[in-house]
Amino acid sequence: MKLASLNQGRDGVLIVVSRDLTRAVKVPQIAATLQAALDDWAIKRPHLEATYQRLNDGLEPDAFYFDQADCHSPLPRAFHWADGSAYVNHVELVRKARGAEMPESFWHDPLMYQGGADSFIPPHSPILMADEAWGIDLEAELAVITDDVPMGASAAEATGHIQLLMLVN
């Protein structure tokens, strides 16, 4: 199933996108935004999956041409953003570019930080910076969207809370 958010409103408008990325359909009868769908995922997911199947079968009368340039980030605002630097070769290159050695511990204890999640930039929008000399770090990342994970959950228990995977950056 492929989901996206149109760049309309503060939290976007949820759409279901066809497998071949050519068609999409708005789903306000299911959820207005991806966050609204996630808030009630156990109920919303089957309806979204059924819509995805109908869209791919050519049975959605309100389907429209899908243009990625019309999209916002899937979750324009998220409740939490924890970034784990698991791609150690990238961390090493970024640190090298600024003349810093990478600590040996990064090879077995990945760096994790809590980043800003209140306003992600749409994929085709310019990245505005006060000074371009600061440099812009752009890399491909994977986002793991979970439901409510209890504190102290083991890795195996946390796996059961994964709801979506997304490409980021």
Where are the predicted features?
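Active-site microenvironments in enzyme catalytic cores
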Residues: 1-8, 19, 35-37, 42-169
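Short N-terminal binding/cap micro-motifs at the start of the first secondary-structure element
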Residues: 11-16
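A short, surface-exposed interaction/processing loop segment used at functional sites
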Residues: 22-36
